[in-house]
Amino acid sequence: MPTWQEVVTSEDRVRLRDWRTAFTRALEQSRAANHSAEIESEGALLEPDAAIGGPIPNGDYRCRVIKVGAKSQGLLEYVTYPAFRCRIEQGQAQRFTKLSGSQRQVGLIYPADQLRQVFLGTLVLGDETQAYKYGTDGDRDVAGWVERIGDNRWRMVLPSPRYESLLDVIELVPEQ
């Protein structure tokens, strides 16, 4: 199986490289729009340097999406969605699938370093049943870091997503 460095698009390589800038800029914008209390209540989930290392195991997860910062005027600077169902399963590589919702990320999780893994995937919209292959439609490509941030708690940090927000964070908690 190829490494993530062999698969990633040049645009997503920049997103991954500049993740921290996107994270802090999104937080600044949301705080300026009076969302400090909501941000603080999330604890490690919305702290840029909260990664503590440890790969995410396969299984079913509750996935809660938080969109931080607005790409353009008129959009909300902070939105939290209720938990959706997600699954991580092993094939030739670890595969992440958001199983429900109107915007569903689907893709592969690659080893990266001691603190995190890389997610490269695509966005499935609405009632679509098939995902585009990563790298074929830049408007659908998604890239991010998967990080453990606590006991049985991970996050997927998606810097500079194509639509709506400056940063998407998906909280991943194993289903009991």
Each predicted region: which residue ranges?
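Mid-length scaffold segments of soluble, non-membrane domains
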Residues: 53-118
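An anionic, turn-rich surface loop/hairpin at beta-sheet edges
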Residues: 71-84, 119-145
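Amphipathic/hydrophobic helical signal segments and adjacent flexible N-terminal regions
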Residues: 1-56
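A short, polar/proline- and glycine-enriched secondary-structure boundary/capping micro-motif
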Residues: 105-112, 128-134, 165-171
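A structural detector for beta-sheet-dominated domains
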Residues: 64, 89-91, 110-112, 120-122, ...
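Edge beta-strand at a domain terminus
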Residues: 33, 38-43, 134-176
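Short, solvent-exposed aromatic-acidic interface loops
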Residues: 99-106, 122-127, 158-165
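Short amphipathic alpha-helical surface micro-motifs
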Residues: 40-45, 67-70, 90-92, 100-102, ...
